[in-house]
């Protein structure tokens, strides 16, 4: 007699920079509902959070996030003009020393990350080798982080080709795919900031001022008689938002997940890494909203 096999649940964590801290809340809420994925894959920030989960370090990682301030964020920015504004070595060495320092094959559950080959535009699935190096390649957002040389190829952020890696989760053996899309409501977010009622704190303003000053130093100063345009930083982040939304919609239309969890994160910017608590709470709320679909597809574990 053939005994039916339990369906394998895969978790596909999308990219979205600082909004990716919402993935922590999503995972916590899934487990509280008795839904435990059998495998996890991620793009960009999703690759980072997914690795922490696959390594069994999510609780430690979450505690660090909740203590993360703007000063800490700025300390990780090793500014460089060789391939990107940020070299990325400080950040990766921090994670190597404090969280994840083992091969992908030795993680507690199957894990993979998505990157993009810079010279060909090919989608690259990183399913073996160093976990930290896979993360570094997947988060290499063009112009912000320098590319990574991996096995003779320059790799950049996987969000350029597959922002929510449903296809990778299927290839890893998932029968049911839960996709977490961080970009459902973010188009135009940065360009709306000037009309927002909430005034940024002095600390936040100083953080954004420093980064904008560094970027602005690379470009000619706008003349007083020219029309006021968005800052370089706003244009870049808004362009990234548009790209991720359009690619995500296209990919998921052709490769639909079984359940989509879509946290509402328009109030968080790409670089708001110090606002982890808000992102995590929104991730939890998004799971609550999707519970009927989740329960229909995924039989909760006792």
Task: For each feature predicted by the language model, list its residue ranges.
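Patatin-like phospholipase
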Residues: 1-43, 51-302
């Amino acid at each position: 007699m053939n005994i039916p096999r339990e369906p394998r649940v895969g978790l596909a964590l999308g990219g979205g920079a600082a909004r990716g801290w919402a993935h922590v809340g999503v995972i916590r809420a899934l487990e509280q509902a008795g839904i435990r994925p059998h495998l996890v894959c991620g793009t960009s920030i999703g690759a980072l959070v997914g690795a922490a989960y696959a390594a069994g370090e999510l609780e430690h990682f979450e505690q660090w996030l909740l203590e993360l301030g703007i000063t800490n964020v700025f300390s990780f920015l090793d500014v460089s003009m060789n391939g990107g504004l940020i070299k990325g070595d400080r950040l990766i060495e921090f994670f190597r020393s404090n969280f994840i320092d083992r091969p992908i094959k030795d993680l507690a559950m199957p894990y993979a990350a998505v990157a993009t080959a810079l010279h060909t535009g090919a989608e690259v699935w990183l399913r073996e080798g160093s976990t930290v190096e896979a993360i570094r390649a997947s988060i290499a957002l063009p112009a912000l982080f320098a590319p990574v040389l991996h096995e003779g190829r320059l790799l950049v952020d996987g969000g350029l080709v597959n922002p929510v890696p449903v296809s990778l989760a299927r290839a890893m053996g998932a029968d049911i795919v839960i996709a977490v899309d961080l970009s459902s409501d973010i188009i135009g977010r940065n360009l709306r900031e000037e009309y927002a009622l909430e005034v940024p704190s002095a600390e936040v303003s100083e953080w954004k001022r420093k980064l904008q000053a560094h970027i602005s130093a690379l470009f000619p100063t706008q003349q007083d008689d020219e029309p006021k345009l968005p800052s370089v930083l706003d244009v870049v982040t808004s362009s990234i938002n548009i790209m991720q939304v359009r690619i995500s919609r296209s990919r998921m239309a052709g490769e639909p997940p079984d359940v989509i969890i879509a946290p509402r994160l328009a109030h968080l910017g790409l670089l708001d890494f110090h606002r982890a608590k808000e992102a995590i709470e929104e991730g939890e709320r998004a799971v609550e909203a999707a519970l009927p679909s989740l329960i229909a597809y995924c039989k909760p574990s006792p």
